[in-house]
């Protein structure tokens, strides 16, 4: 019983020390009132670059290693041109343009650049949960897309745009198709939706695990407290019985025996 109490106290000290050392950032909605109770969970900073399973996650809020992200897809294999501007990486790939009936014949060998840009709004610390502050880089080898960040200024400069806006904190993604294959647009929308659903599922799993741990700890502490209360009650009853027995003995014992007990108190104890 005492070993469990000491272990629980040690765990409590470690948890409180960790929470004091980490710099905590509270997530407060813009329309929140001052007297509104604080949220159950708080946001803590994570490393700018870390791995989760077989995925490598890079946080680009502070302009870290965005321009050094693995050179994917390889230029020598897919013959692609990688350009970076305004925190956006755009990958171009040439493929034959479909033949159309026009006044002047167009050769089938002519090629045109097709650029597809994934546009994502810059997350705000006070509105977006911690898992949504880390941008997810979607890599599509078929359509050659490696983009992230705020692409408002870049999208206006591209001749043939294929824009996809993915907001992971609200309703499903809205896809605007200006030119291109509808099948590819549908596949990209499914990919973005699946990614968003995966992030939400991971968040739910983490919350459920934390709730389960909290529930187990709460029940364990309550059980230990009840055991301690029962032990204290038994000891108090035993103490009262001994006091009553001592009082009766003092009243009925002879003065000689009482004097002998008082003189040899240490031996009796």
Curated annotation (Swiss-Prot):
CDD domains in the cross-refs: ZIP_TSC22D
Q: Which InterPro entries match?
A: TSC22/Bun (IPR000580), TSC22/BUN_CS (IPR047862)
Any single biological process term in GO: regulation of transcription by RNA polymerase II
Query: A single Pfam family, by name?
Result: TSC22
Transmembrane residue ranges:
none
> Its family?
Belongs to the TSC-22/Dip/Bun family.
Q: What is this protein called?
A: Protein tsct-1
């Amino acid at each position: 019983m005492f070993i469990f109490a000491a272990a629980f106290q040690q765990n409590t000290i470690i948890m409180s020390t960790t929470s004091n050392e980490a710099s905590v950032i509270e997530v407060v909605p813009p329309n929140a009132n001052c007297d509104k109770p604080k949220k159950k969970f708080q946001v803590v900073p994570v490393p700018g670059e870390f791995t989760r399973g077989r995925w490598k996650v890079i946080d680009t809020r502070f302009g870290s290693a965005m321009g050094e992200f693995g050179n994917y897809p390889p230029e020598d294999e897919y013959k692609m041109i990688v350009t970076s501007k305004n925190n956006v990486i755009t990958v171009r790939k040439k493929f034959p343009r479909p033949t159309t009936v026009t006044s002047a014949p167009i050769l089938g060998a002519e090629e045109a650049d097709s650029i597809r840009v994934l546009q994502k709004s810059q997350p705000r610390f006070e509105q977006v949960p911690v898992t949504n502050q880390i941008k997810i880089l979607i890599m599509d080898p078929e359509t050659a897309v490696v983009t992230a960040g705020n692409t408002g200024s870049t999208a206006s400069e591209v001749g043939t745009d294929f824009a996809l806006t993915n907001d992971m904190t609200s309703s499903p993604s809205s896809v605007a198709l200006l030119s291109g294959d509808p099948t590819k647009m549908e596949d990209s929308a499914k990919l973005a939706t699946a990614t968003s659903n995966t992030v939400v599922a991971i968040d739910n799993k983490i919350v459920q695990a934390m709730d389960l741990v909290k529930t187990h700890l709460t029940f364990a502490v309550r059980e230990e407290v009840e055991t301690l209360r029962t032990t204290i009650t038994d000891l108090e009853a035993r103490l009262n019985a001994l006091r009553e027995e001592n009082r009766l003995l003092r009243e009925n014992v002879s003065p000689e025996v009482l004097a002998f007990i008082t003189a040899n108190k240490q031996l009796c104890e």
